[in-house]
Amino acid sequence: ISSSQIAIVYADGAIVDGEGYGADIYGNTLAAKLAKVRRNDDVKAVVLRVNSPGGSALASDVIWREVELLREKKPVIVSMGSYAASGGYYISCGADAIVADKTTLTGSIGVFGMFLRLEDALKNKLGITFDAVRTNTSADMGVMRPLTGTERAAIMRSVDEVYETFTSYVAEGRNLPLEKVLDIAGGRVWSGTDALALGLVDTNGGLKTAIAIAADKAELGDKFRIVEMTEAPTGFGAFFSGFMAKVKADIVAGEL
């Protein structure tokens, strides 16, 4: 029996910061899992199964960097599920090959920022108001007052910087001119068929196709076994995770 393995690592859910398990992709947790297979000499190739609408830019970048380190040691193939958009594409774009179903929703190469405001809700609903004493005009920036023009401009600069990073990663990972990436970016969503024509993915197919490509790139022939890297929740955790995944899938389908 061959000791050579192809590891399947699942990235399923919204991408969030930190560590944890459940219906989301926790950036540090997934990065640690990828580091684990990178250090395992029995694992000769990795299939990263991505089914995500995106999420945190920071967590996406943490995962992207670990994918880059993994690629230095062994082939990494991405298999896209129903959707791999925004951060889902961010963590995919550096792989050695990307496989998407024809109906996969992908791309959405874009960045946005949100800033919660509670001032009106607290004042109008609860009668709560706040006064502030501050050392400078932005010291009390938060949910209790509107952003100033300077603060809004600073947040916009941060969004622009993340967008520039995202598009440069796509250009480098997909070997595309940056000008072409900018033409197809801007948050636009593409089907797997369109993504293939645009160069955002390498072929249309499912998980079996991705495994076959991984075996070929690692020169394994048919002498390998598949290992699934999962830490599945049990009991109520399994029920709740499945329920939340269904809710998020319905929301994404409605938005896209």
Annotate each PLM feature.
Residues V9, L48, I91-S92, A195:
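Hydrophobic alpha-helical segments that mediate membrane insertion or helix-helix packing
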Residues Y10-I15, V50-G54, S82, D202, ...:
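A mature extracytoplasmic/lumenal domain signature
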